[in-house]
């Protein structure tokens, strides 16, 4: 399993010297209490109280310390007292880590019988956070705003949700995609500007000939294949009719891929059925098992989906997230559904049933029958996300969907599949998706939601459009027009 660093988030409390050392000390003590309490909640990463920031030099220093600390994935700010926002300008303009503004206060209720000016000098978040909010808006800084008392479960839940895209953003500069072969010939949507992707997301996308992969596969030993076959037998059922030699070939491909990727620091990759010279099979089971271990993947050279999938794997902690393709429709006007699948490469973390390794012919690629995992997908709320290149910008398109149980069998189509109703409906959802230019490949997840993808898009600075139950096509069409105009500037 690919590991993600054990990141931390820095808590920085705003104040000023005006109130004197006793108030500053109390601000510090209260901040530590809040941080300790938040860390008792179910947060995926630890919060560390760093400082009470009281002047421009100290704010600038702590922001740059956060930039330079490899373990810091973002900062959380709160204005306990009033903190004049001009002091924050230098620090915030230089901050390169995600920012969450926690709008809370130490006391939960107004102490009607005892409230006095001493209390008000200490507890000024109601207007102190508004001052901080103004400078955030004036500087046009990407920031998440969470409102509520720090003891409320909803507050810690909102912070926890935001941490996932923040870590994915920070890890973005570690995402490297290896392309084995080029994009599928003449396909438009899987192409794109790899230089701009590195500038915008930090993703490094490199090309390798299939011969480089074949060379890595040739170095695989029978003992290594035996070991991986034993792992397959623990994780998956094996169709008794399946050719063991075909399964062993996929194990060889997987080991060759993993060795190649790990030796060079790649966490995502693509293949293309048009570029298989020297290989006996199109990678199927090999790709599925690697995705289950956290690697991003894109079919037919789709490097944008591969990198996005790796980012969403980070957000989801590896759970319930994988490559998807809109395969075919159930166009019943009363029950419009999308069957999602691919030739071979659907991640088993999306499965509702224990996957089965099967071997069947594949009428594409011109190679031997490949082994693949076959299963029916889980049910429940999910998202399908597509990243496309619009020429002058990237656009992230997110569709919230409702997955349903796959009750029918497909004896003549041995693929892994997921079945869902796109929001607001198949008719309206497909119209909106096509209107926005959404791809046929998506990164699909049960453990990432539209809010987290909106947060991530805000962090990286790309356009994001959402299709859900609130979508009205006339409004959505205008949103796309306005967005296209705005992003030209």
Swiss-Prot record:
Positions contributing to Mn(2+) binding: 300, 325, 342, 441
UniProt-listed InterPro entries: Ara_Isoase_C, AraA_central, AraA_N, AraA_N_sf, Fuc/Ara_isomerase_C, Fucose_isomerase_N/cen_sf, Lara_isomerase
Metabolic or biological pathway: Carbohydrate degradation; L-arabinose degradation via L-ribulose; D-xylulose 5-phosphate from L-arabinose (bacterial route): step 1/3
The enzyme's E.C. designation: 5.3.1.4
Isomerase recorded as keyword: yes
Catalytic activity annotation: beta-L-arabinopyranose = L-ribulose
Cofactors that this protein relies on: Mn(2+)
A Pfam family: AraA_central
GO terms of biological process kind: L-arabinose catabolic process to xylulose 5-phosphate
Record's cofactor remark: Binds 1 Mn(2+) ion per subunit.
GO cellular component: cytosol
SUPFAM superfamilies linked: FucI/AraA C-terminal domain-like (SSF50443), FucI/AraA N-terminal and middle domains (SSF53743)
Superkingdom of the source species: Bacteria
GO terms for MF: L-arabinose isomerase activity; manganese ion binding
Keyword terms, alphabetized: Arabinose catabolism, Carbohydrate metabolism, Isomerase, Manganese, Metal-binding
Keyword Isomerase: yes
NCBIfam families from the UniProt entry: PRK02929.1 (NF002795)
Protein task: Catalyzes the conversion of L-arabinose to L-ribulose.
Family, per entry: Belongs to the arabinose isomerase family.
Protein name per its UniProtKB record: L-arabinose isomerase
Organism: Clostridium beijerinckii (strain ATCC 51743 / NCIMB 8052)
